[in-house]
C-alpha cells in the first residue's frame, strides 16, 4: 500500500498520494457499481500491474497470487487515501461497502496488451466477501 493523506481547511478538502509514481501507467479507468455489496471478481493478468485508488466511498479489495493462491484482503476508503498495488500474475476483485463508491484502476498495459493477457474466474472461487456490518 502506498499511503496518502488528506487536509481539510476553510477552502475544502485536499486528498493526495504524493509517493505514487505514474511512470508505469499506460491507462486508467473508473468503476462504480450500482449498489452496495455488489461483487466484481475475479480478474487477473500475468503481465500487468494494477494500482487501485478509491475516489469515493469504500471497498473490500481482494488480491490473489496466481502462483500460490495466497489471498490478501484490504479495505480501501476515501477517508484514508491509499493506493493498492496489485502485482502482475495476480487476480483481483472488489465489493463496494457503500453506495456511490468509485474506484480508479491504473494499469501498466495498454488495452490491447491487457486483452491478450486476460484471465477470469467466478466471483466465488475465492469467497472472501462475508462482512459483518455494525
List the predicted regions and their residue ranges:
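Non-catalytic, conserved peripheral segments adjacent to functional cores
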Residues: 1-82, 95, 99-134
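Glycine-rich nucleotide phosphate-binding loop and flanking beta-alpha elements
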Residues: 92
Amino acid at each position: 500500500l502506498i499511503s496518502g493523506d488528506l487536509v481539510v481547511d476553510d477552502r475544502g478538502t485536499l486528498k493526495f498520494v504524493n509517493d505514487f509514481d505514474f511512470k508505469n501507467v499506460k491507462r486508467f479507468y473508473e468503476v462504480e457499481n450500482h449498489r452496495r455489496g455488489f461483487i466484481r471478481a475475479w480478474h487477473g493478468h500475468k503481465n500487468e500491474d494494477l494500482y487501485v485508488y478509491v475516489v469515493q466511498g469504500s471497498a473490500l479489495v481482494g488480491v490473489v497470487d496466481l502462483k500460490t493462491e495466497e489471498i490478501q484482503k484490504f479495505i480501501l476508503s476515501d477517508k484514508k487515501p491509499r493506493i493498492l498495488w496489485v502485482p502482475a500474475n495476480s487476480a483481483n476483485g472488489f465489493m463496494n461497502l457503500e453506495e456511490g463508491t468509485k474506484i480508479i484502476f491504473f494499469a501498466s498495459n495498454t488495452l490491447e496488451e491487457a486483452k491478450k493477457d486476460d484471465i477470469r474466474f467466478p466471483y466465488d472461487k475465492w469467497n472472501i466477501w462475508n462482512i459483518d456490518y455494525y
